[in-house]
Curated annotation (Swiss-Prot):
Residues 11-78 form the HTH gntR-type domain. PROSITE patterns: HTH_GNTR (PS50949). Repressor of the rspAB operon. Acts by binding directly to the upstream region of rspA. GO terms for molecular function: DNA binding; DNA-binding transcription factor activity. It comes from Escherichia coli (strain K12). This is HTH-type transcriptional repressor RspR. Residues 38-57 bind DNA. Keywords: DNA-binding, Repressor, Transcription, Transcription regulation. Coiled coil: none annotated. The gene is rspR. The keyword DNA-binding applies.
Amino acid sequence: MTVETQLNPTQPVNQQIYRILRRDIVHCLIAPGTPLSEKEVSVRFNVSRQPVREAFIKLAENGLIQIRPQRGSYVNKISMAQVRNGSFIRQAIECAVARRAASMITESQCYQLEQNLHQQRIAIERKQLDDFFELDDNFHQLLTQIADCQLAWDTIENLKATVDRVRYMSFDHVSPPEMLLRQHLDIFSALQKRDGDAVERAMTQHLQEISESVRQIRQENSDWFSEE
């Protein structure tokens, strides 16, 4: 039986469904290759099929699902090509953002980052991986705000869905949160010093971690990956 999921009546239904399904796919609660039924999803959320269809379209645009008219939809395997391309573009954008942020950061923004890093540490201590995953994203988004370039984050958000699946799978052992926090602290230290070269180096090292992670994860879950 499909368990109904409650939605917030004050927010757009299609966006809520998209976010929940995206999370479920990224966290591998819905495994690669799994069929997705508009009917079943509409029952789960107790809504008509229209907002579900709109959520499916956005998931497809992000490369997470395949929609085949008359044949149904299913969760895509993790595309190695998308991981490589997404990682390359994200690194190019975020390194430039970090360098710019180093020349613009204020004391109050340093405090914001400190609070985020403190919450990351708490999430690690409590083994709350979902919370850490969100705080990790928030840390990177804060940098785009400091650099006065929110569009950079919007661009990253649209291309990193496939990379996020690898990120989440790596938490267990390949790229543990403790290591990622240390890398975030290195980035923060360079920002405090307003050292653009150092922050770019720290960001590069941090984002290259995904390239190391994907090799091992693919060996352990080969059925979940494709070369396309």
